[in-house]
Design a protein with these regions (language model features):
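Conserved small/polar residues in nucleotide/adenosyl-binding loops
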Residues: 282-289
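Active-site neighborhood of glycoside hydrolase catalytic domains
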Residues: 131-181, 185-206, 223
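Entry beta-strands of beta-propeller and related beta-repeat scaffolds
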Residues: 13-16, 73-83, 136-140, 193-198, ...
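Carboxylate/His-rich catalytic cores and anion/metal-binding grooves
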Residues: 79-109
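Beta-strand-rich domains and repeat architectures in extracellular enzymes and scaffolds
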Residues: 1-18
Length: 291
């Protein structure tokens, strides 16, 4: 068990999906486990949601409520839940889709998978949100090329066909691979007319305390490009290889937590903007705890 995936609040329930091996404790047969809660403290575990098969393992991703039924998998009266996840197999990673019409318990993999394939080995962890452009809006996917320390932005009208928008990075902390990005708009002191965009990036290793860590960047997003309010330095190419940044260098960047064990944190879809709620996992402790 590791990364929290597909966090979504729907019909009064918090749904937490998570990386899970239903056949053992080793890093294999990766699927999505599933639990629900009404209060974020007490959880009920359900049957695994999206299972691995002979063609793919189910890596991290996200879930959205498709209120406008833009995907066509549900109806306007009963919108589907749509999951975008990384399908991983044989050194290749691409983004795939599954959908649920029963509130998030039974999932069907889309026959047209993958929905976004760059032909690379480290393209993963899609986080999807709805962007309001003043018109009908559209979907934005934030994902990473992990080893390149780049965040890639794509857009879609129907969650099935994706178009490249822009990239961010490498910049700031690069002492480990970039994974599990998230991005959301956050009002300053509750004023929706004065808001910033926050980009979250998990690093492993390369955190400020020497282990894993979650870095944040505050900036602007115009629907195409993310621009930090205070631009971060572009690292020298050798840093992407030797992964050496000092504590003093790392203190210049934003961190969610200053311990060595905060990783893969993402926020719930379906909550009001002022209720932005993340869930992370304790990466080091997970590896030190016996199954």
């Amino acid at each position: 068990m590791n990364d929290p995936n597909g966090l979504v609040f729907h019909d009064g329930l918090y749904h937490l999906y998570f990386q899970y091996n239903p056949q053992g404790s080793e890093h294999a047969h990766l699927s999505w486990g599933h639990a629900t809660s009404t209060d974020l403290a007490r959880w009920t575990e359900h049957e695994p949601a999206i299972l691995w098969d002979d063609t793919e393992q189910i890596y991290s991703g996200s879930v959205v409520v498709d209120h406008g039924n833009t995907s066509g998998f549900g109806t306007a009266e009963k919108p589907p839940l749509v999951a975008l996840y990384t399908a991983a197999a044989d050194g290749h990673q691409a983004q795939a889709l599954a959908y649920s019409t029963d509130g998030g318990y039974v999932w069907t993999k889309y026959r047209g998978n993958p929905v976004l394939d760059r032909g690379t080995s480290d393209f993963r962890d899609p986080k999807v949100f709805r962007y309001d452009d003043g018109g009908d809006g559209y979907w934005v996917m934030v994902a990473v090329e992990a080893e390149d320390r780049q965040v890639l932005f794509h857009r879609s009208d129907d969650l099935k066909t994706w178009t490249y928008l822009s990239s961010y990075g490498p910049a700031g902390p690069v002492g480990g691979v970039w994974e599990c990005p998230d991005m959301f708009r956050l009002a300053i002191d509750g004023d929706e007319d004065d808001a910033r965009w926050v980009l979250l990036i998990s690093l492993n290793p390369g955190g400020i305390a020497g282990g894993s860590g979650t870095h944040y960047v505050v900036g602007e997003f115009d629907g195409t490009t993310f621009r930090p309010t205070a631009p971060l330095p572009t690292p020298a190419p050798e840093l992407l290889v030797d992964r050496g940044q000092s504590r003093d260098e790392l203190e210049a960047f934003g961190w969610i937590d200053f311990g060595p064990d905060c990783y893969a944190g993402v926020t719930f879809d379906g909550l009001a903007a002022h209720e932005r709620t993340p869930v992370s996992y304790t990466h080091l402790r997970a590896h030190e705890t016996k199954a």
